[in-house]
């Protein structure tokens, strides 16, 4: 039994008392539901710390075992290498993306948690990209629901991201530099333009606020565009992607992939995407060879000019 498992068993009711609950003051009357919720929050926070400690110990043990067996300890780049790669590039890939998080009051608590998790995945995708871009999280309301959810992620302040509190993308960038990506737009984004910042709406709404991002963008006088999904693939479902899928797609295209390949590698399999079949026919070399052979046979069956002249001459002599 490791130290963490022992610690998990040693969690006492005193550790989960209201005195250890965040946001509570002794002597303040609380309802039964509030007390129950606070106890659950305290228990979750305490157990999460212990689980993380156990996970770290397991990773250390795996590294030790790998070293003893002479196996490679790490399969991917180290944190130091990733940081060095990002700083060396400095956003030279030309990709600049702003995640619009000014939807704090429109999402339920569970959707806010999902939104922040997507931001974490976006940050990870950008760090691991061969050409990391400039990433901006805009419109965060200080001490709002999204801000509080960010605080639950240890080390979030150290992410290599530009945070903007109480400031939206229109307060930071020139309007002419912004392109808001929405599936309702009439314009198609066929090429990433240098000097542009592409805005992705950080809204997890399950289609409750359909068209809201597009409406806000047009009201602000911003250029909008949609991803060229229908131009490159056929899908069984609507061409609506999550925030981090849109960012991942942009990252791959910025790194040099073509749209079709990037789309097929990014979107979930449940959407049943298949590359669009074009009308342009590929040359069939087998048919070409067969046609050439038939042409040669036809030419050989034709009487040559010399043969025709000889036959005419023989008829003249007979007469």
Curated annotation (Swiss-Prot):
Gene Ontology terms: biological process: cellular response to heat; positive regulation of 3'-UTR-mediated mRNA stabilization; tRNA N1-guanine methylation
Polar residues bias: start-end ranges: 17-33
Enzyme class, UniProt record, top EC level: transferase
UniProt keyword list: Chromosome, Coiled coil, Methyltransferase, Nucleus, S-adenosyl-L-methionine, Transferase
Localization annotation: Nucleus; Nucleus, Nucleolus; Chromosome
Sequence segments annotated as region (Disordered): 16-87, 275-319
E.C. numbers: 2.1.1.221
UniProt motif (Nuclear localization signal) ranges: 35-42
Listed PROSITE patterns: SAM_MT_TRM10
Catalytic activity as recorded in UniProt: guanosine(9) in tRNA + S-adenosyl-L-methionine = N(1)-methylguanosine(9) in tRNA + S-adenosyl-L-homocysteine + H(+)
Basic and acidic residues composition-biased segments: 40-58, 78-87, 276-302
Main localization (coarse): nucleus
Mutation effect (residue 201 to R): Abrogates methyltransferase activity but does not affect the protein's influence on Hsp70 chaperone protein expression levels or on organismal stress resilience
Coiled coil: 44-67
InterPro entries in UniProt: MT_TRM10-typ (IPR028564), MT_TRM10-typ_sf (IPR038459), TRM10/TRM10A (IPR016653), tRNA_m1G_MeTrfase_euk (IPR007356), tRNA_MeTrfase_TRMD/TRM10 (IPR016009)
Any one Pfam family match given in the protein's UniProt record, by short name: tRNA_m1G_MT
GO cellular component: chromatin; nucleolus; nucleoplasm; nucleus
GO molecular function: tRNA (guanosine(9)-N1)-methyltransferase activity; tRNA binding
Protein family per UniProt: Belongs to the class IV-like SAM-binding methyltransferase superfamily. TRM10 family.
PANTHER family named among the record's database cross-references: TRNA (GUANINE-9-) METHYLTRANSFERASE, TRNA METHYLTRANSFERASE 10 HOMOLOG A
Protein name: tRNA (guanine(9)-N(1))-methyltransferase Trmt10A
Source species of the chain: Drosophila melanogaster
